Amino acid sequence: MKEERNYNFDGVSTNRLKQQLLEEVRKKDAVQLSIFELRHKITELEAKLNTDNEGSEWKTRYETQLELNDELEKQIVYLKEKVEKIHGNSSDRLSSIRVYERMPVESLNTLLKQLEEEKKTLESQVKYYALKLEQESKAYQKINNERRTYLAEMSQGSGLHQVSKRQQVDQLPRMQENLVKTGRYNPAKQKTVSAKRGPVKKITRPNHLPELHP
């Protein structure tokens, strides 16, 4: 159960109360301004994290990755076909060897150059895609770090908002404590003075004018 608090400001001058009230209002306005700025920044951060935009960086990276996967699939199919040809039955291998044996030297040299060119092409593609994967990995890590930073800032803004709420709840008791410290408010002394003075007498005034004698 929450503790109920009774606030008594008897004996405090009106000017002092006005000063304290204006000070608390100023603090409250400053807190509300900070809350507004934090909410605005949170909105901006959430907009940056929105991936539904057609031109978003995440979508571009996703499409690039799909293209990269398609190229790798084609290379896998091509290499599988080459492996199947190499690991065929013995009769096929022997027939291929016989074909090469019957080929002239010039044709063999031409075929060798062609195979070397294919090898270089494959090696270049492997290097290209390896570099591409490394770049994509670094870019993803950068975006992920930015996302964590945005989430941390949003969490910090939410925490400050909760602190400002607690500060507003504690404003009134602080006002009374400040008045007591400055000696402008003493509840016990005020009660003693009121007891010495006794009840306040009510002053009555006649409701009619006095009679005039000739």
UniProtKB/Swiss-Prot annotation:
Region (Disordered): 155-214
Coiled coil: 29-154
Cysteines joined through disulfide linkages: none
Highest taxon listed in the record's lineage: Eukaryota
Keyword Coiled coil recorded: yes
Pfam families recorded: DUF4600
Disulfide bond as UniProt keyword: no
InterPro entries reported in the protein's UniProt record: DUF4600 (IPR028022)
Biased composition (Polar residues): 155-170
Keywords: Coiled coil
Protein family according to the UniProt entry: Belongs to the CCDC169 family.
Protein name, per record: Coiled-coil domain-containing protein 169
Species of origin: Homo sapiens (Human)
